[in-house]
Amino acid sequence: MRRSLNVFVLVVAFCSTTAFAQDGYFANWFERSDRSKADQPHWVTPVATVTPRLEQEVRYDQQWQHNAEGVTTDNYDGGKGLELIPFHNVEVIFNVPPYIDHNNPKVKNGFGDTSFLVKYRLLSGNEEHGNYILTAFLGWSVPTGSYTNGAKHAVITPTIAYGKGFGKFDAQGTFGVGMPIADTTKIGRTYTWNNAFQYHVIRKLWPEVEINSTFYQDGPHDGMKQTFITPGLLLGRFQLSRRVGMTFGGGFQIAATHYHGTNHNGIFTIRFPF
């Protein structure tokens, strides 16, 4: 945990020093972020898959996860939060710890872990210049969860994200590896592979299907695989003001593998890009 906090402090300190060294950094914030967003495709962020695009928004998710005993766990916020574009080709995400209500008197409710994500856009072209994107992520979580609602150690997650559009159709995906900083053989590594396939039916209607897979190495689920098929629908972007918009939607996760911790899970998501 201390190592993760030190890394985060160093990143913030570096960004702050660089920022204040530039005249008009904050005065030019929206001009800079708008220019960054103009250089990439204008798809919407999928329901579950993290988009390779750079976004600047506030996001809230709500999840309902059903286990084999028929008990529903309510996940408030889903670990989402504030997304900013502080530099060209760079996005920083500060995620609020989710609050987890197990609806089970034998399991204590509480907040999950705090997490952060940095995106660096490697390649991109908007709809007039190829309609594609390739982005590298570095995510890390800090074990701030109460009781058993978080991990025992910090987890570092490098990820590669990609996307390509073909007219009104687009595909976005990520492949990442979650690596605990300690007790790796006991906790295990996770390999997550997510792909979303969207079709822009009309101006503000985006139906989609996602395939969300997790592969486990070491730990209690060694050798297992969990895959969900997630049909979803997104509506937006609706302009609330000259600067602020709104996109919302939801999805329904259906387990497609023999092993699955939950099934028939509901997801609601709302975002306010600015």
For the regions a protein language model found, what residue spans apply to each?
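Cleavable N-terminal export/targeting peptides
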Residues: 1-30
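Transmembrane beta-barrel domains of Gram-negative outer membranes and organellar outer membranes
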Residues: 21-274
